[in-house]
A protein has these predicted regions:
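Alpha-helical transmembrane segments of multi-pass membrane transport proteins
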Residues: 1-291
């Protein structure tokens, strides 16, 4: 259960750290915000997310009484293990090396992983069919969840719900901190049942002008938006990453959620840093001359 929760919670940091399709989508939705600046801005929030997961993971491991490998650290053993792991680690280069598109890289990575599995003798022809069936079930689950979230996004846009929400938000208060808190709540809730891409396309033109009216940069808002939607990606009822983690871990939502609650608290703490400290998302782009 802890493994499934840890994998699910940490997985979405990849949407913040380049290369990120979510940030590219936001660049288009916001009218051409610099992709290079967004990529550079994503590093610190992504690292904050990862550190939050590290802290919670250590605390949970200590609480559950997990112990490290017995014996002292051995550099020679590290080298041997690294060499043995190189074929598997090369899979990362295949996926994010930039040689293929995201879709092509995924397909090639599957073939590469399949060949490695046979080489390591971790699977055989008899077990291959079961693996294919399980993969088909998991893919079907993800496609269904994405389809439902896209339908909900279309319904919200058709009924002009986001416009009504934005108008109500401005009528409540002119305090930018309260507006940001309410905006975060709206994005967090919406992210739990909407896919990242339609949510970015719907909420960027609504909330970006509001944030710009009190001096927030398009870079900071983009990171706030994507960070919120990343949290939604690991939160029921849709939570694509969460349910994939549960499926891979062969566990259930009821068993994983007690661990996920601690991750939510830590990650939302990171969200507050991104929201109320502009330097978290703007320091690196400014230092690199991208803003």
């Amino acid at each position: 259960m802890l493994t499934a929760a840890t994998n699910a919670a940490s997985s979405c940091s990849g949407l913040l750290i380049p290369p990120s399709n979510a940030l590219i989508t936001y660049s288009l939705a916001s009218g051409g915000t610099s992709v290079a600046a967004l990529f550079m801005a994503g590093y610190i929030p992504g690292i904050i997310w990862a550190l939050c997961c590290c802290v919670v993971g250590v605390l949970l491991a200590v609480k559950l009484g997990y112990k490290g490998t017995p014996g002292k650290f051995d550099w020679k053993n590290l080298g041997v293990c690294t060499l043995r792991a190189l074929p598997s680690l090369s899979l990362i280069i295949v996926v994010i090396g930039g040689v293929f598109s995201a879709t092509e890289g995924s397909a090639i990575a599957v073939v590469y992983a399949l060949v490695l599995a046979f080489c390591y003798r971790s699977i055989n022809l008899k077990s291959l069919w079961k693996i294919i069936v399980d993969s088909a079930k998991m893919s079907g689950m993800v496609v269904f969840l994405v389809g439902v979230s896209n339908i909900l996004g279309w319904v919200m846009a058709f009924l002009q719900i986001p416009d009504a929400v934005a108008a109500a938000l401005l009528s409540l208060t002119s305090n930018k901190y309260i507006i940001l808190l309410i905006m975060n709540v709206i994005l967090l809730v919406s992210g739990t049942f909407m896919d990242v891409t339609p949510a970015i396309l719907i909420f960027t033109p609504l909330f970006l002008p509001i944030c710009q009216s009190f001096g927030m940069s398009t870079i900071q808002f983009g990171l706030i938006l994507v960070y919120n939607l990343c949290i939604g990606n690991i939160t029921p009822p849709v939570g694509n990453a969460l349910f994939v983690g549960i499926k891979v871990g062969r566990t259930s939502l009821s068993k994983v959620m007690p661990y996920m609650l601690m991750y939510y608290v830590a990650i939302i703490g990171g969200l507050l840093l991104v929201t109320f400290i502009p330097a978290v998302s703007t320091a690196l782009p400014q230092a690199m001359g991208l803003m």
